[in-house]
Amino acid sequence: GNCCRGWNRVRLLGLLRGYDVLVMLLYAVAAAVAAIPEGLPAVISVVLALGVQRMARRNAILRRLPAVETLGSTTVICSDKTGTITRNEMTVTRLHAGGAMYEVTGEGFVPEGEIRENGRPVAPEKMDRNAALRALLVAGCVANDAMLEYEEGRWRIQGDPTEAALLVAARKAGIEPEEERKRRQRLDEIPFSSRAKYMATLNAAEEPEEPTLFVKGAPEQLIAFSTRVLRDGHAELLTEEDRQRLLEVNTELAGQALRVLAAAYRVLPREARADHELAERNLVFLGLWGMMDPPRPEAVRAIADARGAGIRVIMITGD
């Protein structure tokens, strides 16, 4: 509109003074160019850059405007759990062995923390007095395919994060997973399967000389497979009351949003091999691990922001 009015004024003055149309057009273009400050393009660029920088600090970098329009119409967000909402660093926080419940401090794959009973730390040098607890932690080391290594100033894992969490818990109790594996050389194994819901390893042992079959998997399965329970350093008969109590502990831990695993064992003849028939009967129950995957701090804020914007957040997980 301003350009049209400016052109009309130039044309009117030009006609009154008898200028040629081409001359009047040149005057109009010159007036239009002179009306725009020389620094305006730079000012616009700086303003846009500052705006983008401010949006970037809020994690809102836009490349396609339709994406923003779609987000503005969103009412529900469905998100994966492991590695998205959580850190993908499984951490053992509870242990149940020998009829006692233990708390494990620390987070992630850094083996810094302690095991507590009734709020009091269980010293690593006194771990032998807690035979069932030690046996549970050792079983988590040998019936395990993960690796925990200290490289370049940080702890790294190789393998499944759930199995790595068992190694971290053992180290917090002063148990070295690699030393236990050397003492109990693996002779045979049963890989984990979703049908069986457990995995097992047959390991050589110093005492007794017969190999030991360690089984690790779903608590309901292992409780059903067990006929005895390790308590006070002795394998005692597993009564129906004991079974119900173990199932209640499993339900209690699961109710705290913990992933629960169980371990059991049995001693086999020297010539025996690991097979499902042997792994599913006459086991000695050791105990339970309760573990969680800590949430990402930024995920907590993102979910709060989404809820504040009226967006429902639904977690989709394989658990």
Features from the language model and the residues they span:
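Conserved cytosolic headpiece of P-type ATPases
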Residues: 1-318
